[in-house]
Amino acid sequence: MARVTVEDAVDKIGNRFDLVLVAARRARQIATEGKDPMVDVQNDKPTVTALREIEEGLVTAATLEQADLQAQEQQEHAEFASVANILSDQ
């Protein structure tokens, strides 16, 4: 597959500044948070993988925000369950 150009990804996001924010956020998820790439990695670095995901329309600012909210809700639910378990043992 040909390399992703910034212009291709900008068309999906809207402007270069938002593209940088979305791509950096997604690359960080792939590199350090253990999130699975949605495209074939092909020995690419996380930043290139993030740009390819954006170009293919798989990642947007809205999808990242929604995923973060779901993760936060799951964490809060687990914390509440732990607290309830501790209180019920007393």
Curated annotation (Swiss-Prot):
Its EC number is 2.7.7.6. Keywords: DNA-directed RNA polymerase, Nucleotidyltransferase, Transcription, Transferase. GO terms for cellular component: DNA-directed RNA polymerase complex. Promotes RNA polymerase assembly. Latches the N- and C-terminal regions of the beta' subunit thereby facilitating its interaction with the beta and alpha subunits. InterPro entries: DNA-dir_RNA_pol_omega, Pol_omega/Rpo6/RPB6, RPB6/omega-like_sf. It catalyses: RNA(n) + a ribonucleoside 5'-triphosphate = RNA(n+1) + diphosphate. This is DNA-directed RNA polymerase subunit omega. The keyword Nuclease does not apply. It comes from Alteromonas mediterranea (strain DSM 17117 / CIP 110805 / LMG 28347 / Deep ecotype). NCBIfam families: rpoZ. The RNAP catalytic core consists of 2 alpha, 1 beta, 1 beta' and 1 omega subunit. When a sigma factor is associated with the core the holoenzyme is formed, which can initiate transcription. The keyword Nucleotidyltransferase applies. GO terms for molecular function: DNA binding; DNA-directed RNA polymerase activity. GO terms for biological process: DNA-templated transcription. Belongs to the RNA polymerase subunit omega family. It is an enzyme of class 2 (transferase). It holds the Pfam family RNA_pol_Rpb6.
